Amino acid sequence: MSAERYLNHPTFGMLYLVAPAGEGRDVYATLYAQKMFFLVTLQPRGAQFEVIPFLDARHHAEIHLSRCRRENSPEKDRWQELFHQTFI
């Protein structure tokens, strides 16, 4: 991942990418109040936002981080740092 990804939520403002969640979905968190998490599905005509609990967001991030470790991804350190900044 070469650059951070952001989305603009119509009510909660800027969201940043926390982790891919699979099946064309990603987990995003609010930029200024980091404890709101969304499962976002990008669609041709916009985005679908689903609020998810902290532990669900963390679970998706842990799964992604485990996959990066298993595949020895060059982005592993970046995802590890983002995980710690967001959840620890």
Language-model-detected regions and their locations in the chain:
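Short, compact, well-ordered microdomains
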Residues: 54-88
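Long, non-catalytic architectural segments outside compact domain cores
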Residues: 1-55
